[in-house]
Amino acid sequence: DLGSSTKEGGECSFKSLEAATSDLASNKIDVLVTAPINKDNIQSDGFDFPGHTEYLAKLSNVDNALMFMCSDNLRVGIVTGHIPISKVAQTLTQENILAKIVQMNASLIQDFVINRPKIAVLGLNPHAGEKGLLGDEEKDIIAPAVKRASEMGILAFGPYPADGFFGSTGYKKFDAVLAMYHDQGLIPFKALTFGQGVNYTAGLPIVRTSPDHGTAYDLVGRGTASLSSFQSAVFLARDVYLNRAFQKEVSLTPLK
């Protein structure tokens, strides 16, 4: 069964995840770096989630963790996460977009030590709705959420049309980008950084990272798989852990 999905493989994946999260909870380890899972064969009575992000959020008693794809030159967060695209528009609200902006801003400060991060927010519709011609979500939901974030002192801008934003390298002017749905954010992220990117779960009390690729059964036994993304995930987990420790120390011993 080498290189194929099996029930036993899914069971082993979940047992490994349980053991790791148990060690994390008992402070035997400091960070969690997860390998890719098969989201289908891991499903069981103990794991009824679309992915690691939702499982770890539930385990940590966090309502709304942020899926945050990170590389040296690009960071992309996702508002709606692992849901069918047919449900994206109905899921978007001012409140959940604002919550993600606030969460992203806090992570950039605490986890990446960026004092005044600049956040770009993407639109949902083609050309960011063209002032309502191609959809109302931008003017009715997204733009008001961005305005509310700005009123809170967060440097949030948008909504920007996703295609032109990445095509013109506009992302380079910002510390992070907030996409409305999974593929809107992950397609450009992986196209620009594949092999170097990391999936980071922001908003958790623990530090968790993962490589930006899947199980890649087709590469099993060939000796051609790259370790670079997993290596980047290990390094980012270490960096975030140290950054959090630094921020905590600074807050406890402020300059007088």
Question: Over which residues does each language-model region extend?
Answer:
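Short beta-strand/turn micro-motifs at beta-sheet edges
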Residues: 66-67, 109
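Conserved hydrophobic/aromatic beta-strand scaffold that supports enzyme active sites
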Residues: 55, 67, 76-78, 206-208
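A glycine-rich helix N-cap at a beta->alpha junction
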Residues: 53-64
